[in-house]
């Protein structure tokens, strides 16, 4: 079928493009609005006039604002960070990662990009604009009121960095365990034609459909009494798992593991079994063939599955709020705790700044892995 035959009529193209543009605006508006609010004083952030929220006259009157130079250079830093990461990062990771450690290479690369962006955007950029603004006259005058004091409050004064660290621990643990078990189980089930493999998949699907609260209730007595149960083995040093990140990792892995097994099994099913046989002929064991031949082909699927596992652990509220104490709380329950009847408008803007902060790693993750995610979803959707 030719390209001309596949081309949509002009009215239909206009209608579909208009609808997609409108839907994108509707979907992106909440993120855009809370981002704008997080840089304003409480007076501007909760003003009934949308223009005052955007331009922040009260914030600018307090001596906090951005000039045209600030805005242009800030957008340039964001644009070039995204563009250079998407274009060069996959090639650099592939070149410099040790053989068999590509995932670790991606994690290190993502951390380096994130740290570098924070250093440039919040460290070097204010110094540069502070020198340029007095020299450029009208272009150096504040045109939009903006302040970063709410981010300083939430990360420095409120100790949100500790919540961020706990989220990283939980997320890294869930993703690591889920992918390790999921790849092995998915590969075995994809290569097995027995009836037992079918029933294992059905049982996994049943466990996946259970409400999260049911699993939490089942694990709760184990975690609370863990010190008593482990004391015959570990003696007086037996730990209480309740309130610790390890408890949350165990529950979230139990919730997420059926999904990862199902998804990875579908990816492995699309890889011809001839690759396994060829590797076996060349002298590889089953595990060596899996590690050196199958897994390099599977990386897009593994990264896609890992992204969904990351989102489950990173955004979880129910399990983390029930099983973690205040000192080990992750970011999502910590933000929810900032909203209560006693909060002031300043506290609410601080909570908004915290909410914006937790979305930044998600954008960075999708930006860095966009090609692998699209490739993995395409591979999982097409058989053969």
Language-model features: where?
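Membrane-interfacial, low-structure loops and terminal tails that flank and connect transmembrane helices
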Residues: 1, 90-103
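Short, Lys/Arg-enriched, disordered terminal segments
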Residues: 1-7
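A structural signal for multi-pass alpha-helical bundles of membrane permease subunits
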Residues: 6, 12-91, 114-384
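Transmembrane alpha-helical segments of multi-pass membrane proteins
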Residues: 97-119, 207-208
């Amino acid at each position: 079928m030719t390209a001309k035959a596949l081309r949509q009529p002009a009215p239909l193209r206009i209608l579909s493009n208009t609808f997609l543009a409108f839907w994108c605006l509707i979907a992106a508006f909440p993120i855009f609005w809370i981002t704008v609010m997080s840089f304003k004083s409480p007076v501007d952030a909760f003003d009934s006039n949308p223009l005052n929220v955007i331009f922040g006259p009260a914030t600018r009157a307090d001596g906090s604002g951005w000039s045209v130079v600030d805005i242009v250079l800030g957008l340039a830093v964001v644009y070039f960070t995204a563009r250079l990461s998407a274009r060069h990062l996959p090639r650099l990771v592939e070149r410099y990662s040790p053989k068999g450690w590509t995932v670790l290479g991606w994690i290190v690369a993502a951390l380096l990009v994130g740290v570098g962006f924070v250093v440039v955007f919040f460290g070097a950029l204010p110094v540069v604009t502070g020198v340029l603004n007095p020299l450029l006259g009208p272009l150096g005058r504040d045109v939009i009121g903006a302040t970063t004091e709410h981010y300083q409050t939430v990360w420095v004064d409120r100790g949100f960095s500790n919540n961020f660290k706990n989220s990283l621990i939980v997320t890294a643990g869930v993703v690591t365990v889920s992918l390790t078990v999921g790849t092995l189980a998915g590969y075995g089930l994809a290569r097995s034609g027995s009836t037992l493999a079918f029933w294992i998949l059905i049982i996994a699907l049943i466990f996946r459909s259970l409400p999260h609260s049911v699993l939490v209730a089942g694990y709760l007595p184990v975690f609370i009494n863990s010190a008593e149960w482990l004391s015959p083995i570990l003696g007086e040093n037996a730990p209480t798992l309740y309130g610790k990140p390890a408890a949350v990792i165990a529950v979230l892995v139990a919730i997420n593991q059926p999904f990862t097994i199902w998804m990875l099994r579908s990816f492995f099913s699309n890889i011809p079994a001839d690759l396994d046989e060829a590797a076996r002929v060349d002298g590889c064991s089953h595990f060596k063939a899996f590690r050196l031949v199958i897994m390099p082909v599977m990386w897009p699927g593994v990264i896609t599955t890992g992204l969904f596992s990351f989102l489950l652990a990173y955004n979880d509220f129910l399990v983390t709020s029930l099983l973690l104490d205040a000192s080990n709380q992750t970011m999502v329950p910590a933000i929810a705790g900032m909203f209560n009847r006693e909060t002031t408008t300043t506290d609410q803007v601080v909570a908004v700044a915290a909410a914006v902060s937790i979305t930044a790693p998600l954008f960075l993750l999708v930006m860095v892995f966009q090609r692998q995610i699209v490739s993995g979803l395409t591979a999982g959707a097409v058989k053969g």
